[in-house]
Each structure stands twice: as structure tokens, then as C-alpha cells.
Amino acid sequence: MLDNRKFSEQELVRRNKYKTLVEQNKDPYKVTNWKRNTTLLKLNEKYKDYSKEDLLNLNQELVVVAGRIKLYREAGKKAAFVNIDDQDSSIQLYVRLDEIGDQSFEDFRNFDLGDIIGVKGIMMRTDHGELSIRCKEVVLLSKALRPLPDKHAGIQDIEEKYRRRYVDLIVNHDVRKTFQARTKIIRTLQNFLDNKGYMEVETPILHSLKGGASAKPFITHYNVLNTDVYLRIATELHLKRLIVGGFEGVYEIGRIFRNEGMSTRHNPEFTSIELYVAYEDMFFLMNLTEEIFRVCNAAVNSNSIIEYNNVKIDLSKPFKRLHMVDGIKQVTGVDFWKEMTVQQALELAKKHKVHVEKHQESVGHIINLFYEEFVESTIVEPTFVYGHPKEISPLAKSNPSDPRFTDRFELFILGREYANAFSELNDPIDQYERFKAQIEEESKGNDEANDMDIDFIEALEHAMPPTAGIGIGIDRLVMLLTNSESIKDVLLFPQMKPRE
């Protein structure tokens, strides 16, 4: 099976070129390093204002750089122009036979697009004014045995862009910039929280119970203990244990795993941040969330007004605040502020064609279904939707004025959820009853219900201070701030269906 690989004509030509190099004792794969003294970006910035004459009269030292060949064009039989890329920039090379020698020039003419080369030379400008390196030495550092896609067409198949991200990164500078922006956003967020005195921590990925969110878990088997365990669906319960333990501000940025669908907004493994701050409430987190979005945006964009899917969003304005029940009333006219029985709520659902599962037969669940069906998609500007029903918020503190609802909010922008936050439930007796209600829901078909976590209950019984907690989807935040249409555009290696 391993010997059945088939190669295109162009791939065979490249392999024959490599074979010849090996026979000539010039195997590029045996090169162990190439000590650069600068980068292409630094060269472009340093010499951008130098004229052709300035460079001719300049007492220059050799520049030593490296990059991938992206363009090759001959200028007669004894010279050629080549464009190379490195991580952050590109530059033109001017290669002449009389400067690098007969044998080196002959080797050079056998280089292919995609090959990685090392270069030594001095800076110049062409007659057309293009900044270039006049090469004194050109060395093949790695041979590309596969050709690159056509430079104008690129990768036409969107699936191939995601499957072969390495090729996408080679041919598309903008894709590289998106992932550099992602890293900058995460670093900015870490620095912002560190400067506030919060501590970054790491908690387990393998959990013996499912909890901390309403989601379907991945299950794996732990051989040594001969038991099934879950890949975490949230970091919440471990982080709150740390608040019990005496830390007053903790956060974790890490991978979360949910055994659910894939779409432009969902990937089964994704990155989130969860933050817990003692002695604060959800209103504190509303203000902090606005700060987070603004400081992360400033790290990658020069304007507080961003554009996403052709809609302009002003992140400098205060985010709106909307109670879930008020939003439903505004859009549908249905008033869930009124006390009502489950039967009355079911009749309203039937009238408005809202589907209700068996485990959702409660007023709180039906309120949430109305919100998701009619209100969520109408939200454009950044809006904190708060006041979620108790039934769908098993870890949030009940609102003291109306215990049907909780002190919880979600941040929505353009119909998408970006954050979920609570004034955290710290009453162990209430938490125990909420877990029992979750078990009851599971028996009625809710496969996203939380398990009973007695250890967490016991932690709360040691007293957790009033605490505010929030989760923010890093991938969606990056999508928003880089104007990326799909979550796959901000994940280096998104989950893909197996090839047929």
C-alpha cells in the first residue's frame, strides 16, 4: 500500500531534480541551518525611502535572508528576477550569473516555485524603482516536491483550504495575518486580566462527571482506572473550587470539547476563556466585558467602528441591556412577566408554533424557546440579554426580586452569542436542588443536563464568597474582530469530515 502513491508529471520532474541534487552531493534536506541577520519586513521598512542612487552610494554590509520562491522570471540567459516570501513580508531578488558564478546560476535555474532558499546580497533598486536584493549567493535550503496552486486562482475548493491549511498559509498572506491577529488578541486578553491581578490557571481536561454547561460531551476510556471519562465541556466547576480555596480572581484560556454539530459558528473543539472574580456580580462583568472587547479590538484594529458581514458595529458605545422577557414582549407581544401555569405557557407555544420537547415543559424553558425563536436573530448592536429563567441556568444565582429568573446575561452581537455570565450560585442547598432538577430533566430526554457533582456541593459547603463568572468564546471574538465569516477561518486546523 505504501508504494502505491501516484505523482503528477510536474511532481515527477521535481523528484528527478531532487535526485540529481543528491547525486551531485547537494541534498538540500541535509542543510541544518541558515543564519539570517535580518528579515524581509525589516529590510522593506529600513530601505523604503532610499532611492536607487542612495543605495548605490551606500557602504553596505551583506544582508542574509531566507524565504520561499513565489515568482520567477528570467531577464535574458544570464539574469533572473525572483520574489521570495518569509513570515511577514516579501521582496524581489536580482540574480546574475556573473555575480553568483556559473555553477550556482545553473543550479538556481533549476529551482522551482515553492522552494525555500537562503540569500546573501546587497540592497538595490531596479530601473522601475522596486526595492530588491542584488544576490551574491543563493542556496537551496529545502526542495518543494509538490507545486503550489496557481498564484491567481489560489485554492478554489474551500474544503481544501481548511484541510491543507499549510498550503493556504503559503499562498495567502491575509490568512497568516488573521492567525497573527488571533494570537495578539489572546495575548492582549491575558495581559489585560493579569494587570487587574487575576491569575491564569490550568484545570483538568478529563472529567469524571459532565458539568459546567449544557452540552453533549465526548466520552473516552481511561484504561488504568477502567472507567469512562468526559472531555470537558466547561472549566467552570474547577475554577469555582479555586474561588472557594481562597483565590479571588482566576481565569483559564483553553480548549473545550462538545460532541455537537459543525457549522460556520460551531466546531466540536473550541477555545474559550472563563473568568471568576470574588465579591463581584454580573453587572461588574457587563462593564468588564465592554472593556475586554474594546482593548482586544484596539490590539488588531485602528478604529473602534468595525465591520462584520457588511454591518458596522461601534464598540466604543455603551452596550445595550435587555431583559429576556422584555425582548420577547417587544418582538412578539407575549408578556411572560405575568404569572402563568405550565399549561398556559404550552398553549402560547402552540399558538406561536414553538416546538417544546418533553424535558422543556416548564414556563422557564418555554420563555427561553421564545427568545431563541423570535428575539435572538433580531439583535444587531452589542446587547447584554439578562434575566434568564432558573430552569435553564442551574449554576446562576436567583434574582432576589423575582426568583423565577437568574442574575445571568449573554452578550449578543448580530444574532450571535459571544459571552455568558452569572452572578454565581453559592448556596450549596439550592445548588443541590438544581442538580436534582437536572437529573430529572435527563430522565425526560435532556442529554445536555448536568450530572450531580457531590464534590462541588461539598466545596460550596465550605463557603464560596459572592462571585461573578463569565465565559467568552475566543474563536467568535476573533471572527468578529477580523471580519471572518466562518469559525473555520480562525482555527488553524478545524475539524473536517473524513474524505470519502
UniProtKB/Swiss-Prot annotation:
Binds 3 Mg(2+) ions per subunit. Gene3D superfamilies: Bira Bifunctional Protein, Domain 2, Nucleic acid-binding proteins. It catalyses: tRNA(Lys) + L-lysine + ATP = L-lysyl-tRNA(Lys) + AMP + diphosphate. It is found in: Cytoplasm. One of its GO terms (molecular function) is ATP binding. Mg(2+) 2 binds at E417. GO terms for biological process: lysyl-tRNA aminoacylation. InterPro entries: Aa-tRNA-synt_II (IPR004364), aa-tRNA-synth_II (IPR006195), aa-tRNA-synth_II/BPL/LPL (IPR045864), Lys-tRNA-ligase_II (IPR002313), Lys-tRNA-ligase_II_N (IPR044136), Lys-tRNA-synth_II_C (IPR018149), NA-bd_OB-fold (IPR012340), NA-bd_OB_tRNA (IPR004365). Its cofactor is Mg(2+). Transmembrane segments: none annotated. Its EC number is 6.1.1.6. Keywords: Aminoacyl-tRNA synthetase, ATP-binding, Cytoplasm, Ligase, Magnesium, Metal-binding, Nucleotide-binding, Protein biosynthesis. Mg(2+) 1 binds at E410, E417. Disulfide bonds: none annotated. GO terms for cellular component: cytosol. Belongs to the class-II aminoacyl-tRNA synthetase family. This is Lysine--tRNA ligase. It comes from Mycoplasma mycoides subsp. mycoides SC (strain CCUG 32753 / NCTC 10114 / PG1). The gene is lysS.
